[in-house]
Structure formats: structure tokens, C-alpha cells
Amino acid sequence: MSTEEKSLNFIEQIIEDSLASGFPQDKLRFRFPPEPNGYLHIGHAKSICLNFGLGLRYNAPVNLRFDDTNPAKEEQEYVDAIKEDLQWLGFNWAEERYASDYFQQLYDWAVVMIKNGKAYIDSQSSSAMAIQKGTPTQPGVDGPFRNRSVAENLTLFEGMKNGDFEEGTHVLRAKIDMSSKNMLMRDPLMYRVLHRHHHRTGNDWKIYPMYDFAHGQSDYIEQISHSICTLEFVMHRELYNWFLDQIYDTTKVRPNQYEFARLNLNYTVMSKRKLLQLVQDKVVNGWDDPRMPTISGLRRRGYTAKSIRNFCETIGVAKRENVIDVSLLDFCLREDLNKTAPRVMAVLDPVKLVITNYPEGKEEWLEAENNQEDESAGFRKVPFSRELYIEREDFLEVAPAKFFRLSIGNEVRLKNGYIIKAESVTKDLEGNITQIEASYDTDSLSGSGTEASKRKVAGTLHWVSVSHAIEAEVRLYDRLFIDEAPDAHKEKNFLDFMNKTSLEIVNGFVEPSLINVKVNDKFQFQRLGYFTVDKESSTSKLVFNKTVGLKDAWEEKGKKEENLLMNMLKEINKYVKEKDENTAKNTLIPIIENIKSIDNYSLVINTIVKNIKNDNNALLFANLILKHSDKVIAKDIEIDHLTKLYSMSLKSQLASVRILAINNLKNDSENFSNFQTQLAELKNSEKNSNVLE
């Protein structure tokens, strides 16, 4: 811990209260219980850091327990991946346990519960049970098999265990209270028949316990003191305690369940089902695709374990759900890599630069600092020659006033090298620049101390010597989704929000010091961002993944789009006031083009809703967005908001608002008929020929 004492989170306070009440510290025990049906993702990292962090804080053991109670979805591949991820994150577990280790004990307890009249075999169909269970506002009713005799229940349960029945014919249910306000207490399932091969127990078992029965009992077997879950299990706590009541021995530690808010990240999907869909549909290239929020995907992209741990510590532990900006995760990564990643030069979109007054055949090895944030990182030598590669975007023949890069007649400094001035260009038959000719100031070598070296110029460019450059494949990764909440829109498939430019592969050049890089080595490509050597890289073909940019491009883009929308409303005010028809049309054209350029679905929807008010200009803006944005259609807007928009717009004093509302209604067949009365009234009262038309 740091010298500055941090305040306790509410889970830590609960533990402190337990200790203060006399609970022995040597009895503290925690666990991390993943189901091996997928890869761990960044959401799991919060729970991992919490549980293992508690273990470190209180010097208490933390078990890794695999909740392997559903052989239909679980595989050894996932077990191995989870263990690898935990170790990579820097955590070691006390014992490796499996719920399947306890199958016999769980079965024996179930038999005892049957004998005690606390469980019974139900032979209804799942649909019949669902009806019989009632609703949140209506109590359930007893099923026809609830009062089976103990003897019949034991015989049927034994038959289920022996594989005498098909899947779905019988289940074991706890006998609790069919009128409970908590629907989970209305005789929940304990066991079901599954004729599936289990990755550890093979075909030994034909019945498998349900999560709610296995989880708390496993905690009890392992003597877990504090069972920490996410908030969706709040309603399960009553059932957790009821099951423990059936087996609890007062001489042992009784586990208690506590809940905290899970991690929700914007621009991210963390449902295992949806992540699996991305993999199976080949939207991504496997679970460790660098665009995935899985721990293995983040690791491959170049995230460090330290940055993820720092991120989890920064967001803290809370009782209320909230959405964390993924930019914070990137910030934690930049903060770590800035201190540790060596600086190197790479050119991703090269154009040749020839220094015409530099002697042919000459080369110099210039000194370059590896990391100005770390004095111990030292220096390296970088070759400089007559022919160099620079980024194509770093040159313009004729540059605007605030272009701080290279242009004809202007000077820039080459990083660690000389000041150059662009003199001319060579173009191909299509007019594309193939070469830039420049001259250099022989006395301007960086760090030489000469007057020329101290001269201020427009900017500093990175470069690579042509004769020494090493080819490399560079994979430019970006966010997988373009919307803040891709799986939160009822009328939309989360795949509708895929970022079509989430991966761009380019072939560039890197400096020769990178010839012997190893997988997972991390670098800052100066002026470009942080990059990591991919697992597919080899000595014959270097492959780098873009890990994160030097700045948050999405934040800049988001602000730009928000500012664009604000400015559009100002332009609409001009449009409405303009008397000249041609000038008005010319004002409207860029407004429509700007509407089409907005990618953020949530921003578009929110802007429409925000402008549904008794203001003609605002209504005009909302209707323009609905008509011209290719990101939304009418049914994407909540019906109450949409109805209000149409109703207010048809009554607007501005003919242009009424016209747009009618056009939008024509494209909205589901709602068009609902406004026939208002449209008929317009026909009778409207004086504007355009509206009537």
C-alpha cells in the first residue's frame, strides 16, 4: 500500500466489522469462482482484483474454484485459459478446486433434503412449471408432484442419477414457498438430467446440480468466509442462505454472500454469449483477437497486467451500477507504457525523402534516447543516410498557416538529426508524389550545441533510413463498436454497431534496432502511439499491433461531433431567418451533410429527444436528423418521444417543420395511420401549397 492511507471500500469495511466483532482473522477465506464456459474478460478483472486483493490485504487464502456444473458449455480449453489469465494478472491462488469435486457430497445432501421433505421430483414440462410458478405480481401454485412421497422421490432421483430418464423428463426442486415474493424461492431447481460428457468426470454423472444449489454449498465445503458476488445475485442471497440452513453445522464457518456493482464499460460488449457469437461468426479472429475485451485479447493487444490492476483500483468497489468510460482503461495503459516502453521510429505510410546535398554512400549513426521518462533506459544508435522514409501525411506541397510539418520552402527537424528544407517533389503520371527532394543544414545536428542546432523550426518529424529500414506488418486496431452501449438498444442488433475500421493492416518500415524483438515486446512508435509485437511475428516478418494512441482520439472525435451538433443548431437559426430562398438552401446543404457524418448512434438519438420541445428551430433540427441520419430510423426512438415529435411538429408554425414531419411519417408506416386525424385537419386548414402537396 502507498504511504497515503486509502479509505476502505464497503467490502473491506464489512470485513473489518467482522473482525471487530470477534471473527478470527485466520478464518478469513475468499474465492474466485469462474464458470469455464468462455474466456475471462475485463469485467472479471474487477472481481479478480477485489478477491485476490482482499487475500493480500488480510493475508488470507483465495481459492480458484471452477463452477463446472454445466458440461454442455464447459471445456478444458477455458480452464487452462482462465488459469493463464490469472497468473498473467499477477495473482496466485491457494487451492485449485472444482464444483465437480463435490458432486458426490452435493448428491448426498440432496438425498438428505428429500428425506427431510425439503426437496421433491417434479415431472412437469419446463413450460408448465413456468406457468405454475406465477409472476412477480401473482403468487405461484403448488404443482401436481409437490407432495410426492419421500419413497417415490428417492426412487426417481436414483433413476435420474443412473441415467434411466431422458433430459427434461424430471428435475429435483427444493420445497420452499410457492407464494414467496422472491420468485427464486418458489421451489427452485436443484438438479436436472444431462446426458453430456463432463471435461473432468467423464460420463460418471447423468445429473448435474444447478448453480444456486452448488455455489453456496461449495463455499461451505471450502469454508469461505466472505462470498463476494455481483449485484445481479442480490435476490439469490435468500436462497443461498436457505440452502445453507439445510446443512449448516454450527462448529464450522458459515459463508455470507455480499454483492458489489459489476464493471460496465462503454463501447464494449461483455456478455459471454455475445462474445462467443463474435468468435463463431468470425467477426473477430478468436477469443484473443486484440479487439476483444477478453484478458487474452487485451494481453495480445499490448495491455499490461499492471495497467489493468491500476484501472480496477481506480474505479473502486461500489454498491450501485454505473458505466465506466473505456478511455479510463486506456489512460491507465498510457500511464504505464509511458514509463516503460522504449521510444523507436517507424513509418507506416512512407514516402521517400532524398537529401540532395548529403553525400551519396555516407551514413551516420546518431544517438537517440530510449525513454526520456527513464534515465536507466539509456541510448541507442540510429542510422542516418541520404535517403529516408517519412510519413506521407507529414508533407504538403503548399501548406496552410498552421501546418507544423514539412512543405516546399519550409524547414523541419528530423528527430535526433538535422534540420531540412523541402525544395521540390517528383510525381508519377497520376500526379501522386513519389519522392520529396530536400536539403539539410550541415551544422544543425540535434544536440551538437551549435547556433544552427538551436534554430526554431515548424516541427519535428520521425523518419527511417531507407537502406537500413526493416519491413513490418502493422495492425492498426481500434474500438470494435462505434456506439457507447452497443447491446442496450432493444430495436437494434449489437452487430449493427460494429466499427468497420476496427482493423486496418498496413505495411511500413521500422528502424533496425527492432530486428531481434520478441513477442509481447512493447514500444512507443514516436508520434504514432504504443505498439506491441504480435504472437504471429517472426524474424522473417515482423508484426506489430497498435495498442493505444498517444492521445484519446475517440474523446476528440466525440467532442468534435458534439460541437458539430451544437453548431448545426446555430446554422438552423440562420436558415430559418434567411429570406432569400437560394441562400437558405445553401445554408441547409452543409447541415444535412454534417448530420450524415455523425457516427455515434446514442448521440444522434439523444439529440433528437433533446430537441423535442416547443421550439420551432429545435423541432426542425430533430426532424432533419430523423430524415437524413443513416444511423437511426423512427422505430429506434421510444414511442412516447416519437409521438410527441410528430404531434408537436404537425402543429408547428413553420411550414418546413410540418413538411419534414409529414415526410418522416410517410417513411414510418407503423405510425402513419395514427396521425390521420391531424393530417386531415391540415388538409382543411393548410394554406401552404407545399404542405398540401
Cite the ranges covered by each PLM segment.
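Substrate/cofactor-recognition hotspot
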Residues: F311-K319, V323-M568
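Alpha-solenoid helical repeat scaffolds
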Residues: N586, P590, L603, T607, ...
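Alpha-helix N-cap/helix-start positions at coil->helix boundaries
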Residues: E578-N582, N614-L619, A655-S656, S685-N690
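Amphipathic alpha-helical scaffolding segments comprising HEAT/armadillo-like alpha-solenoid repeats
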Residues: N567-N573, S597-V609, V632-M648, N671-K683
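N-terminal catalytic cores of NTP/NDP-binding nucleotidyl/phosphoryl-transfer enzymes
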Residues: K6-E16, A20-K83, H199-T230
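A glycine-rich helix N-cap at a beta->alpha junction
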Residues: Y78-Y102, A110, G117-A119
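Structural signature of alpha-helical solenoid repeat scaffolds
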Residues: I592-E593, N623-D630, N663-K666
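Active-site cores that bind ATP or allylic diphosphates and position pyrophosphate for catalysis
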Residues: D68-N70, Q76, Y98, V112-K274, ...
